[in-house]
Amino acid sequence: MLVVGAGGLGSPVALYLAAAGVGTIGLVDNDVVDITNLQRQLLHGTRDVGRSKLESARDRLHDVNPHVQVVLHASWLTSTNALDIVRNYDVVVDGTDNFATRYLVNDACVLLGIPNVHGSVFRFDGQASVFATSNGPCYRCLYPEPPPADMVPNCAEGGVFGVLPGLVGTIQATETLKLLLALGDTLAGRLLMIDAHSMEFRSLRISRDPACPACGTRTLTQLIDYDQFCGTPGLHTNTEARVEEINPDTLRIWIQNGSPLQLIDVREPTETALGIIAGARCIPLGTLEQQLDSLDRSLRTVLVCRSGVRSARAARQLLSAGFSPVHSLAGGMIRWQED
């Protein structure tokens, strides 16, 4: 089975399935462990901060069950690679936190006839269901169109009650095992809604939509541009296109541990004269393009500015030029000095 996202939802799913003896678990992620992840992403610990989430997850799963085969897909799921990855598994678990990837996972599962075990969390609210079964509805039957991109933050932006991903992820693990073992009645055709604030569970019946663009009469024949569909340009234009932010604590740990990286401050000379992070190289944003050949494209790169805006812009520029991995310091020097 395949888990898309080694974060808050993917953690309990992968742990329970490894413990249950599932032979092969595929993991899709391209992020690193940040200290702010730890209150909800229990695959990872403090010693893993700065590591690849996939490597951290693999080691933790082998602690639980050394016999499980953990297949690592170190990339973001995109329209280009989704079908090639998903087709190798019997069940897909959606542990993502953005609409573009949710629609992508759904459509890939519909095209390949593979069940999609869905879960989502936001603040105190959670949802779970099973989509894309032979007779059941798919995600698009429930949500034909995505909400406006600027109205729906992800977990990092909007926040989530730390234990809620564990609750929803455990439900996803339960549904996955039931699918693999052909046991009981799954959540196919039902949406389970959880309000952790009042600790109420409700179940809503959902039906297959005959007019669904994915599984209905307007049957989907190929994957589309999901960033354009969801109004989130740049999120999945290629496997390295998303700018990853790190917080000051993570950067400090990398520096203290001597992790190989190049630290670039893209502020102007008048700004850097007031102080820089030790070891940083000062390259103003306006001259960055001319300096690209003097930088190591294969070395982890962290970009810094005053507040995080220019560094994010610089990170996108480096990603487009083939640098990987690239990170922007969240909050810039303002947050660095505050912390």
Describe the role of every protein-language-model region.
Residues 1-242, 262, 268-270, 279-290, ...:
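Adenine nucleotide-associated cytosolic modules
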Residues 27, 328-329:
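A short, hydrophobic beta-strand element of the alpha/beta-hydrolase
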Residues 241-257:
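A short, well-structured juxtamembrane/interface segment
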Residues 274-275:
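Cytochrome P450 core scaffold surrounding the K-helix E-X-X-R motif
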Residues 304, 327-328:
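Conserved active-site loop/cleft motifs that coordinate metal ions or position small ligands
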Residues 308:
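Conserved G/P- and acidic residue-centered "switch" motifs that form tight phosphate/ATP-binding loops
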Residues 312-327:
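C-terminal structural segments of small proteins and small subunits
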